[in-house]
UniProtKB/Swiss-Prot annotation:
Cofactor annotation remark: Binds 1 thiamine pyrophosphate per subunit.
Signal peptide stretch: none
Lineage start: Bacteria, Pseudomonadati, Chlamydiota, Chlamydiia, Parachlamydiales
Cited CDD domains: TPP_PYR_MenD
EC number: 2.2.1.9
Catalysed transformations (reactions): isochorismate + 2-oxoglutarate + H(+) = 5-enolpyruvoyl-6-hydroxy-2-succinyl-cyclohex-3-ene-1-carboxylate + CO2
GO biological process, one term: menaquinone biosynthetic process
Needed co-factor(s): Mg(2+); Mn(2+); thiamine diphosphate
Keywords on record: Magnesium, Manganese, Menaquinone biosynthesis, Metal-binding, Thiamine pyrophosphate, Transferase
GO function term, MF aspect, one: thiamine pyrophosphate binding
Name of protein: 2-succinyl-5-enolpyruvyl-6-hydroxy-3-cyclohexene-1-carboxylate synthase
Entry-linked PANTHER family: 2-SUCCINYL-5-ENOLPYRUVYL-6-HYDROXY-3-CYCLOHEXENE-1-CARBOXYLATE SYNTHASE (PTHR42916), PROTEIN PHYLLO, CHLOROPLASTIC (PTHR42916:SF1)
Tagged with keyword Cytoplasm: no
Organism: Protochlamydia amoebophila (strain UWE25)
Length: 520
């Protein structure tokens, strides 16, 4: 009985186009484990811990642009999937959650490994099915624009779960459901705003060309976050605003009082985005693959970015005069570069120098909290064709190393830049690395002795989670190469295997740099 039910679920997943499964084996999902092991056309990653398995799947989705499944046993194993499910929900990723469950008669009984799994993910799945013996469904009901939960009720595991499966399986092709929209909200925004600023957040690689063309035709000032893939593009240099520190005052003082924000792509990391909650006279229009405005106000055009900008034509061509602001902005950047030279051991300076030394065409994953902000602020402007990624759906620090390993590519140098607390959150992540093709992996752990993002805001020391730990033992535990840097070496060679680099900023230099920047 269990075998037939498992067979139906896996057939649906394969027909949908799923070719990779992250499996945390247990007694209740044994029928899935045995069945998946017999299918030669798929890749199965085996995990001992479900939370990291799910974040690894998030990384695989980002790398392949294909749906990935996570398969768990029953009980609290299912609850471990919630953080990654939330991340996938807010970034519209096709994450399939296949959770084994005890039979329905055990619900609300408190029996061992019986929790209420139906509805456990609340609003964070866009489709949920609860299945038992002789119950069938079609997975093509799933739009693929967010997580799906299949809860599968099995009887007690038995020898019959390990049946040989002689059937051949047909593999489908993943085709997400199209999003239909019109462009009148963008037309209206362009017509009403005299002083717009465009902010480009996270984009997929196939979206950058039509968006680049749109930006060059619009000719409005644009702030490009690293995840856009356009940050260092020389074709946008004449439009590029490189710093948004004190952006409202600086733009107004130089004759360009911002009256509109056009957001393209993911929700921005920059502080100016949060400022919009308290800025009532600024119109906001967002164009995104994700259906979230990212604010309590503003319009959202939920659409396929590639198709939208391939077909969009400006109804008229406005003229924006922002050269004075751009010149002042560039002067600020030059002053900042001088400060990096004055304080080369400060944390922000180390980010700048690291960005100059990482090999061209590397794939870079930037962790949440300080690293993503410091990369956007300090990375060099030379176009080295980096691909920059992050988990910015819910901005959490869990699962970052697992996501990076899922994202990593055998054909590229792969770099993760993570905070110390972020790394401690995900120490099981390297479990999977021997199951992946040989990778060139460099994990930079910025060890600033705790959560320094809170240092300027909160006086109570408990916010910092201060520590005196180092990460050599972590590297040794997993058999990784280890380096400790207090400054950036003149030459950096990408590792040919797996390497952990502990980057230790000078706290006094970091504090001096922060104070100098406040006086700029």
């Amino acid at each position: 009985m269990n075998h037939e039910l498992a067979l139906h679920v896996i057939e649906q997943a394969l027909q949908y186009g799923i070719k990779e499964f992250c499996v945390a084996p247990g007694a209740r999902n044994a029928a899935f484990v045995y069945l998946l092991a017999q299918i030669p056309t798929i890749k199965v990653y085996y995990w001992s811990e479900e939370r990291s398995a799910a974040f690894f799947a998030v990384g695989r989705i980002k790398a392949t642009h294909q749906p990935i499944a996570v398969v768990t046993t029953s009980g609290t194993a299912v609850a471990e999937l919630l953080p990654a499910t939330i991340e996938a929900y807010y970034t519209s990723l096709p994450l399939l959650l296949i959770t084994a469950d005890r039979p329905r008669r055990f619900r609300l009984s408190g029996a061992p490994q019986s929790i209420e799994q139906v509805g456990i993910f609340s609003c964070y799945t866009i489709l949920e099915k609860d299945l038992a013996e002789n119950e069938f469904f079609q997975l093509d009901q799933w739009s693929g624009r967010g997580p799906c939960h299949l809860n599968v009720c099995f009887e007690e595991p038995s020898k019959n779960d390990n049946q040989e499966c002689a059937r051949s399986f047909s593999m489908g092709i993943f085709t997400p459901k199209p999003i239909l929209c019109d462009s009148h909200l963008l037309d209206e925004f362009i017509q009403k705003c005299q002083f717009p600023l465009v902010i480009v957040g996270a984009l997929n690689q196939n979206e950058t060309t039509p968006i680049l063309s749109f930006l060059r035709h619009l000719k409005a000032p644009v702030y490009l976050e690293a995840q856009s893939g356009l940050r260092e593009n020389s074709l946008l240099e004449n439009l590029r605003i490189e710093s948004v520190e004190d952006v409202w005052n600086c733009s107004s003082q130089h004759g360009y009082p911002i009256d509109g924000i056009l957001r393209i792509g993911g929700i921005p990391t920059a502080r100016l985005w949060r400022d919009l909650e308290e800025t009532n006279n600024v119109k906001v229009c967002s164009i995104s693959e994700n259906p979230f405005a990212g604010l309590t106000n503003g319009n959202i055009i939920h659409t396929s970015l590639r198709e939208f900008f391939k077909n969009y034509r400006l109804s008229f061509k406005p003229i924006y005069s922002f050269q004075a602001w751009k010149d002042a902005n560039r002067s600020y950047q030059l002053e900042l570069l001088k400060l990096f030279e004055e304080e080369p051991l400060a944390e922000l300076s180390l980010f700048h120098l690291l960005s100059k030394k990482i090999p061209e065409e590397s794939k870079i994953y930037v962790g949440n909290s300080l690293p993503i902000r410091e990369w956007d602020q300090a990375a060099d402007w030379t176009n080295k064709h980096f691909q920059v990624f992050a988990n910015r759906g819910a901005n959490g620090i869990e699962g970052q190393l697992s996501t990076f390993l899922g994202l990593a590519s055998p054909e590229q140098n792969n770099w993760a830049i993570l905070g110390d607390l972020t790394t401690l959150y995900d120490m099981i992540a390297p479990w999977v690395i021997h199951q992946i093709q040989p990778l060139k992996v460099n994990v930079v752990v910025v060890n600033n002795s705790g959560g320094q993002i809170f240092a300027p805001k909160f006086a109570h020391l408990s916010f910092l989670n201060s520590h005196q730990l180092n990460f050599k033992a972590f590297a040794d535990f997993w058999g990784w190469e280890y380096d400790c840097w207090h400054e950036i070496p003149t030459t950096i060679l990408g590792s040919q295997t797996s390497r952990l680099i502990e980057l230790v900023p000078d706290p006094s230099a970091t504090d001096r740099l922060r104070k100098k920047m406040q006086r700029m």
